[in-house]
């Protein structure tokens, strides 16, 4: 926090500054708040990413052989950033197991997660989630975690999921392999964590 002219408190976030004086009364202040929120969210853009899909079924095939498959449940594409830590793994593990993508027994939407519904989870490691396009429109994956530490982190993430739920309900693809991933998206329902 900084103090501007006339002693008014200013909230800063990277390049944006928000003046707290007369905040509610000014339409420009709403825009300032949105910029501040966007900027603060950008701080978390370089942490582990999950693309979670509610599925009726999903499977992973490697070299023509199905190595994992689930019925109804959640499929998560898992992207690791080069700066990810154990805290990022724990955060995403809790979010994945707690996210409420299903209705309850009364039909109320967004009330149950995989645990309440006793469903399965399929995780697929996907370093391309941190891909960006270069000026020549070619993919660049320099922000993705390198293979050896990424495999260790991914295995740790799977271990956390198995410890936080039922181990036999957590499935995964094959780290580093070329995989064919098939799914029937239920809804469709897809969120990014």
Predicted regions, residues:
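Short intrinsically disordered, low-complexity coil segments enriched in acidic
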Residues: 1-4, 39
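Acidic, Ala/Val/Gly-enriched low-complexity intrinsically disordered segments
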Residues: 3, 8-9, 24, 30
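Cysteine-centered motifs
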Residues: 13, 39-42
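N-terminal, polar/charged subdomain of small-to-medium soluble alpha/beta proteins
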Residues: 46-136, 140, 148, 152-193
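An anionic oxygen-ligand recognition environment, strongly enriched in 2H phosphoesterase
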Residues: 143
């Amino acid at each position: 926090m900084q103090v501007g002219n006339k002693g008014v408190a200013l909230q800063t976030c990277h390049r944006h500054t928000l003046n707290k004086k007369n905040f509610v009364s000014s339409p420009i202040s709403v825009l300032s708040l949105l910029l501040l929120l966007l900027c603060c969210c950008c701080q978390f853009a370089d942490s582990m990413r999950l693309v979670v899909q509610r599925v009726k079924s999903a499977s992973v095939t490697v070299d023509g052989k199905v190595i994992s498959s689930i019925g109804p449940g959640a499929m998560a594409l898992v992207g690791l950033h080069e700066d990810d830590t154990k805290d990022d793994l724990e955060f995403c593990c809790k979010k994945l197991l707690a996210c409420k993508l299903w209705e309850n027994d009364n039909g109320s939407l967004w009330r149950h997660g995989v645990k309440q519904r006793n469903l399965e989870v399929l995780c697929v490691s996907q370093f391309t989630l941190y891909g960006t396009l270069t000026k020549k429109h070619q993919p660049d994956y320099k922000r993705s975690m390198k293979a050896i530490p990424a495999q260790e982190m991914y295995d740790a993430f799977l271990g956390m999921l198995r410890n936080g739920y039922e181990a036999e309900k957590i499935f995964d693809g094959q780290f580093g392999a070329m995989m064919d991933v098939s799914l029937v998206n239920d809804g469709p329902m897809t969120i990014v964590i």
